[in-house]
């Protein structure tokens, strides 16, 4: 078999090999009923609200939807389109499975176009798709980044084929598509396009006006999303920008690039990726000048971007694994090493992808089993109830934490119940809680508590329970609270419990007839 240049196709460049890599990329997500990513239950709760609340009077009386051109709608839009066929939970699972599939396809296409053929080292980049941001449940961002990689790979292809109308249209319209998936996905796409423009037009250290003009004109193709951004980010929707130059955190996010469950395994995996890039930078491996420039642009952006960027938290954490992936794609074995050495490297890359995929599959299966145990309480929650959930995360927080802080949202999806677990992000979410729920208990920010003796910033469980507006809720759901720390108030009637979770009915005090009559005399 030969490639487009008439050269022999090696086994790591075959369709069968690429197909195997794509299967390995989706394998961890196949078993769990819903993807066990930290924020996903809250996202699914929002999807359930957005797809129609006609049959859920409690939800329709509390939530409102404010449609606006938010740069945070990728998975939302796809689930909205698919839910009539399969329901919200299966639609969410299907869309999230597509994220690593599209990401891997995009990364492999970038590597193939940059090197002229798929290098033996390319597969080393794929495990970075299952990165900390993905495990955290930043699914709209992850979809935006996947689209950015795929469209950038197509841009490189049509630039090689000398089809300027096609690649310019891809940048122009692709920018808008990626923006609506997630605004930071558009930023990632911009970094890729800017780095590529520098490679194409900056040909020497002596910068000319023609070079600057060519780079600027190519980058202006990215500007179409500025129209909805101006509409969206006007008024009170600008968001916070803070924590510049947290240098120690920068290295921490690189070490945490694949953070999930096993600190040594994931830390060493990240260091392997750094080491591979280092081999290219010092010249031991061949490095694509095009992708090296893209990597340097992303690295510069990573160093300067703050933790919070116009309301987007963990901004630098999201960029770290994507930057590493591009750095790995830039490297390749030197031709002088021969086919045997390249084949050995390809086998090592395949082994790395397989090991990472198997480990993530095991991790996700364990999270899914754990979630099933936490959610045994759901049948005891009356349909349409108003539930205040209080979650006590582990203390102290470690590398691996149980993904429980957003599990209360499963009561929205499976019991049509209100739960205080939607995100409070003005201008970044379409769903808002109405005035019937006091704001101090309306959103996810009200749900986390700490137990006595725990040195965390959340309020004490007992203090938070005392503040519950009893008239606004029917039930209290405690997660992560052991029996010794559970309340014994007379207005809380136990309904269900196990060693980790408890549900109480809130007993409202009846006004006595004497009190209704008022004072005498």
Residue ranges of predicted features:
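Short acidic/glycine- and proline-prone juxtamembrane loop motifs at membrane-interface regions
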Residues: 136-143
């Amino acid at each position: 078999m030969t490639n487009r240049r008439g050269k022999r196709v090696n086994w790591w460049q075959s369709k069968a090999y690429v197909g195997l890599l794509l299967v390995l990329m989706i394998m961890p997500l196949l078993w769990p009923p819903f993807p066990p990513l930290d924020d996903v239950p809250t996202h699914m709760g929002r999807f359930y609200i957005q797809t129609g609340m006609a049959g859920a009077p409690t939800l329709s009386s509390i939530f409102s939807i404010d449609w606006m051109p938010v740069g945070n709608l990728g998975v939302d839009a796809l689930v909205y389109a698919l839910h009539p066929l399969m329901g919200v939970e299966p639609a969410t699972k299907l869309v999230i499975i597509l994220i690593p599939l599209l990401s891997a396809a995009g990364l492999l296409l970038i590597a193939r176009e940059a090197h002229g053929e798929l290098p033996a080292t390319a597969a080393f980049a794929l495990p970075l798709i299952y990165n900390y941001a993905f495990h955290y449940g930043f699914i709209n961002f992850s979809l935006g980044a996947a689209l950015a990689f795929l469209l950038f790979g197509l841009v490189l292809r049509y630039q090689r084929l000398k089809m300027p109308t096609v690649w310019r249209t891809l940048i122009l319209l692709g920018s808008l598509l990626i923006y609506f998936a997630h605004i930071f996905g558009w930023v990632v796409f911009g970094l890729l396009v800017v780095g590529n423009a520098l490679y194409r037009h900056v040909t020497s250290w002596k910068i000319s006006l023609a070079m600057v003009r060519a780079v600027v004109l190519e980058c202006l193709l990215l500007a179409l999303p500025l129209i909805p951004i101006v509409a969206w980010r006007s008024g009170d929707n600008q968001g916070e920008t803070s924590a510049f130059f947290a240098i120690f955190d920068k290295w921490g996010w690189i070490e945490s690039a694949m953070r999930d469950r096993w600190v040594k395994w994931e830390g060493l995996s990240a260091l392997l990726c750094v080491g591979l890039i280092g081999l290219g930078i010092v010249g031991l491996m061949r490095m694509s000048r095009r992708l090296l420039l893209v990597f340097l642009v992303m690295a510069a952006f990573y160093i300067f971007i703050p933790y919070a960027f116009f309301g987007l938290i963990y901004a630098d954490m999201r960029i770290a694994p994507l930057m590493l992936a591009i750095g790995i794609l830039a490297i390749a074995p030197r031709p002088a090493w021969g086919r045997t050495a390249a084949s050995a490297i390809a086998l090592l890359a395949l082994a790395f992808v397989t090991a990472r995929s198997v480990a993530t599959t095991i991790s996700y299966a364990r999270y899914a089993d754990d979630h099933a145990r936490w959610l045994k309480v759901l049948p005891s929650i009356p349909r349409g109830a108003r539930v205040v959930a209080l979650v006590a995360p582990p203390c102290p927080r470690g590398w691996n934490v149980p993904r429980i802080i957003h599990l209360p949202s499963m009561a929205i999806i499976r019991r049509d119940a209100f739960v205080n677990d939607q995100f409070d992000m003005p201008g970044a979410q379409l769903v808002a809680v109405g005035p019937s729920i006091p704001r101090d208990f309306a959103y996810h920010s009200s749900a986390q508590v700490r137990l006595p003796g725990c040195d965390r910033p959340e309020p004490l469980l007992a203090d938070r329970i005392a503040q519950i507006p009893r008239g606004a809720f029917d039930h209290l759901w405690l997660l992560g609270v052991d029996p010794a720390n559970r309340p014994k108030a007379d207005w809380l009637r136990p309904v269900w419990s196990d060693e980790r979770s408890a549900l109480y009915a809130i007993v409202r005090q009846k006004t006595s007839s004497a009190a209704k009559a008022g004072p005498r005399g």
